[in-house]
């Protein structure tokens, strides 16, 4: 994560986030509503456990009490029950990312769960939402797409695909003479 975008995200979280126990001057969680959230900030908010939502914010006002319904994709005024806006989540996985307090903890937890179940001879669990892969293209992959795909355990990746690299231990030996 770049320090400038992390700093900008931390500034936003400072006003809306929750204190992190035993970590001074840092917050997590919260919600961020925006008409358009730049991808670099959207991803950093996801990493921080915040809930970024792109929606029409023209009817939202400072200090207004709202009812946020992520499963319905609606924000309503708490006092009048007026529908303020509707939205669609970029991915259903965002719900798990918020529950896990960030994208990185979710990835780690999901991979540990998957590997443990595999070792125990159990089927993959359905407690996690999985990203949808929409690859219906018959085109081949570029070398870069194949390289990333190999790291993720698939043939290749396309723009917009979600993939997680398979991690293992790396050892480096340095000989002193």
Where are these regions (language model features)?
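Flexible inter-domain linker/hinge segments
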Residues: 105, 109-152
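Short glycine-rich or small-residue beta-strand-to-loop segments that form or flank ligand, phosphate
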Residues: 165-168
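Conserved small/polar residues in nucleotide/adenosyl-binding loops
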Residues: 174-177
């Amino acid at each position: 994560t770049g320090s400038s975008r992390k700093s900008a995200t931390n500034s936003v979280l400072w006003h809306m986030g929750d204190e992190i126990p035993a970590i001074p001057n840092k917050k997590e969680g919260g919600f961020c509503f925006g008409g358009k959230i730049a991808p670099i900030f959207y991803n950093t908010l996801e990493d921080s456990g915040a809930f970024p939502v792109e929606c029409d914010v023209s009817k939202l006002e400072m200090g207004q009490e709202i009812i946020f319904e992520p499963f319905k994709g609606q924000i309503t005024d708490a006092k009048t029950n007026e529908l303020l806006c509707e939205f669609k989540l970029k991915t259903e996985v965002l719900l798990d990312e918020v529950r896990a307090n960030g994208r990185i903890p979710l990835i780690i937890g999901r991979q540990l769960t998957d590997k443990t179940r595999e070792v125990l001879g159990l089927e993959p669990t359905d407690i996690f939402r999985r990203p949808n892969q929409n690859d219906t293209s018959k085109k081949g992959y570029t070398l870069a797409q194949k390289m990333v795909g190999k790291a993720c355990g698939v043939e290749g990746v396309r723009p917009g695909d979600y993939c997680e690299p398979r991690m293992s231990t790396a050892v480096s030996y340095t000989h002193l003479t």
